[in-house]
C-alpha cells in the first residue's frame, strides 16, 4: 500500500469554535468580556503574539492575524499611561482585523478599551492563568488543530503499548485481525477509517473517524460496537503510529523477508515508519505474529536487541570456532599419530 496522498490542513477556524473547544479540551477557563459575533472572526495562524511593540506605536511588523495575548507587561504598560495616550496605544491594535484578544492573570482591562474592542468587533477573553501557561496550552491546541492530516483505509490497534497500523487490500481480514487482537486484551483505536495527524516533525498521531468511532464491520457478521461488547478497556482515542503491518495475498513469486536484517520503511505524511509485510496463507496465525512484531519493536527500542542480528552473530561465532578447531586438529595430526 502506498501512502502517497497529499496531507490536508485546516485553513482556519472561527473564534466561536476556538472558544468552545479550548474550554472543553483544556483547563484554561476562558471567560468572555464582551458580546460580539465570534463567527465573523477567524483564526488562521497557529502562533500567538504579544503586541508590546504595537502598543508602543511600532506596527510595521505587527502580526495582527494571530491571537493577541495581553499579559502583565502589556497591561502595566497600558495602565501607566494617561487616558488619552492609553486609548491611542490600544487603537494600534484594534484598528487591525485581530481574531481575538486574551488577557491573562485576571488583569483588568479599562472599560473604555473594552468598548473600543467591542466597537471594532474584536472578541475579548480573560483567564486566570499566567501568560506562560496560557501560551503553552493555546499553542498546543492550535498546533493540533492546524496540523497536517490524512485519512487512510486500515485498522489501528494498541498492541502491548505499540501503535500498530494494519493496512492492505479490502477483504484480507484487517478488521478480523484487529477484533482478534482486542479479544486478546489489546486496544482498538480505529477501524476502516484511520485519521493520522502529523504533530511536529516526526510524530504521527492516529485516531478514529468521529462518525464511525469504535464500531467495526465484520463481513458475515455485521456491525460490532467494540466499546459495548468488550468494555472501556478495549478502546483508546489516540495512539502514535509506530509500526505499519501490510497484509498481502500470498504470491510464491515474491521474495518475502525471512531473516529481518533488512528493515523496510514507508513514508506517511513525510515521516518514515517501519513497515512489515505479512503474506496471508492457510495456517498462519496473523494475530500472534502481530503481537511478536510489537514485542520485537519494544526489544529494539528499549534494549537495542534485534533477533536476526543476534542469530547472525551466533552463526559467525560458530563458524569461527569450527575453523579454529579444524586448524588445531590439523596441527596435532602432523605431530602425533592418532591412528
Swiss-Prot record:
Mg(2+) binds at residues 175, 217. It comes from the Bacteria. The keyword ATP-binding applies. InterPro entries: HPr(Ser)_kin/Pase, Hpr_kin/Pase_C, Hpr_kin/Pase_Hpr_N, P-loop_NTPase, Ser_kin/Pase_Hpr-like_N_sf. Its EC number is 2.7.11.-, 2.7.4.-. It comes from Chlorobium phaeobacteroides (strain BS1). Disulfide bonds: none annotated. The lineage of its organism: Bacteria, Pseudomonadati, Chlorobiota, Chlorobiia, Chlorobiales. Both phosphorylation and phosphorolysis are carried out by the same active site and suggest a common mechanism for both reactions. This is HPr kinase/phosphorylase. It catalyses: [HPr protein]-L-serine + ATP = [HPr protein]-O-phospho-L-serine + ADP + H(+); [HPr protein]-O-phospho-L-serine + phosphate + H(+) = [HPr protein]-L-serine + diphosphate. Its cofactor is Mg(2+). Keywords: ATP-binding, Kinase, Magnesium, Metal-binding, Multifunctional enzyme, Nucleotide-binding, Serine/threonine-protein kinase, Transferase. The gene is hprK. Belongs to the HPrK/P family. GO terms for biological process: regulation of carbohydrate metabolic process. SUPFAM superfamilies: HprK N-terminal domain-like, PEP carboxykinase-like. Homohexamer.
